[in-house]
Amino acid sequence: MIKYTLGSTSLATVRGQEDYTQRIKNMEISIDEWSQIKNNIDYIGVTENFKDVITTFSTDPNQTPAGFRRELVLDGNVLKVDLVRDISYDSDGELRPTNVLFSADSANPYEIVPMKNLISNLTCNPGIVYDLFINNPEANIGNQFKDRDEVMTEIAKILGPGVDISVELNNPFEKNFDTILEEAEKFKNMFSKHRVVIKVPHTGVVTSENVNELMLEDKKLSRDFKNVSTEDSFYSHNLCLKLREAGYRINYTLMFEPYQTNLALQAKPYFINTFLRQRLVQSETIQNYVKIYDLTKDITILKNLRQY
């Protein structure tokens, strides 16, 4: 089987773009694409986005960086190559080894180093940054890192271009949306627009008025999940939509039920983090209570089940 590449078309390069096109000469094309190119195209070049990606990430001068899919764009008599963000791709537009992409949930730079070439996404939130790393002397060796920005800047240096970084807003209930945008902009500057993903929690019954109840000893809300206004129910959904309109990709997280996930998709997130294991554990616990009651007919078992 004959392999056709952009390099085999012998197209002239757009003047001044030789260093860019050197990276894509090995890009494979179909025989139909090759025929169309030979008969209709005079030059080969790259898009402005392609240039921005290469400028952002210093990589081998003969390669395109991981985390991007190569696409052909026709512009008059010029065939341009674009780099589209897609973490299922390794360097040079090659697919990763499997369809399963791995994500790490960590804010420990020392922990991230050995896995940096195996993951395609990293998630972290303020709690992980401070509780599990900065304020943990066993993890934050020599108290080297003092605040969240220092940690995230170091993580950005460690991870390559092929890894998205999902970082959670410090206060998703901030009433001033411009303040939220300022925080998102700061992370975009740290990670680049190509890697940053803003993590938004599914709030549901949790609001700015009762969120502090989750920090108390029993970590329970004083009202049940049905006691919530329609506006509060869809607060985080609308926050996702607003951030998306502002140009950010969203990691919508903290769903515990399948039906929540289906509705969350209407907010057009880039990622969904759904904790179905929690529902599995609860279902198995309920099933166990029922089995014990069937065997013992002990009424206290039913009382414990209701409390659960």
Locate predicted features.
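Charged, glycine/proline-rich intrinsically disordered loops and linkers
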Residues: 24-68, 209-231, 290-308
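Solvent-exposed alpha-helices and their adjacent loops that cap or buttress functional pockets
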Residues: 94-96, 191, 241
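Long, compositionally biased, glycine/small-hydrophobic-enriched stretches that function as flexible linkers
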Residues: 1-99
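Active-site beta->alpha loop and helix N-cap motifs at the rims of alpha/beta catalytic domains
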Residues: 68-83, 98, 103-234
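A generic structural signal for ordered alpha-helices
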Residues: 90-93, 107, 221, 242-243
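Catalytic alpha/beta core domains of metabolic enzymes, predominantly
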Residues: 215-241, 246-308
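Repeat-unit-sized solenoid/scaffold elements
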Residues: 56-64, 188-214, 269-297
